[in-house]
């Protein structure tokens, strides 16, 4: 859903993409928080994937934040190490696909979190398209 207007994003807007070799550093990965809930054997990584300026202009986006909450059973790994692994898997998927779009970023995250040590993934997206 477009955050500014409240209008649902159409399939054409979500599938609109650009070749990945035309963009330098299309995505910016940031770890926002690492939680270790008490009395559990799990760790929660709050990861934000942002579309870089080059990608936003190519796709006609004003703002594109993909927020993910990844619940894992990894208790000994640090946030930065998991972020590097997550980024590597997402970029590996997108490089093999060759096309980057809103749908493909979500599919790449699904690929990166489809591991035995990931219990659940919660998603929240802040996407705003340019109106002018």
Swiss-Prot record:
- Annotated S-S bridges: none
Q: Where are the transmembrane segments?
A: none
A GO BP entry: viral process
Q: Which keywords describe this protein according to UniProt?
A: Host-virus interaction
Q: Which family does it belong to?
A: Belongs to the geminiviridae replication enhancer protein family.
Question: What is the protein's known function?
Answer: Increases viral DNA accumulation. Enhances infectivity and symptom expression.
Please give the subunit comment from the record.
Homooligomer. Interacts with the replication-associated protein (REP). Interacts with host proliferating cell nuclear antigen (PCNA). Interacts with host retinoblastoma-related protein 1 (RBR1), and may thereby deregulate the host cell cycle. Oligomerization and interaction with PCNA are necessary for optimal replication enhancement.
Name used for this protein in its record: Replication enhancer protein
The source organism is: Pepper huasteco yellow vein virus
């Amino acid at each position: 859903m477009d955050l500014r207007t409240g209008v649902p994003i159409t399939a054409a807007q979500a599938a609109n993409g650009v070749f990945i070799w035309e963009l330098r550093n299309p995505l910016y990965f940031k770890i926002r928080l690492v939680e270790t809930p008490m009395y559990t054997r799990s760790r929660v990584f709050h990861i934000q994937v942002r579309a870089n300026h080059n990608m936003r202009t190519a796709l006609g986006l004003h703002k594109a934040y993909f927020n993910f909450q990844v619940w894992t059973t990894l208790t000994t790994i640090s946030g930065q190490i998991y972020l590097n692994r997550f980024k590597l898997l997402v970029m590996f998927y997108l490089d093999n696909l060759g096309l980057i779009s809103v749908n493909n970023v979500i599919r790449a995250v699904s690929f990166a979190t489809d591991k035995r040590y990931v219990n659940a993934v919660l998603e929240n997206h802040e996407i705003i398209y340019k109106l002018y």
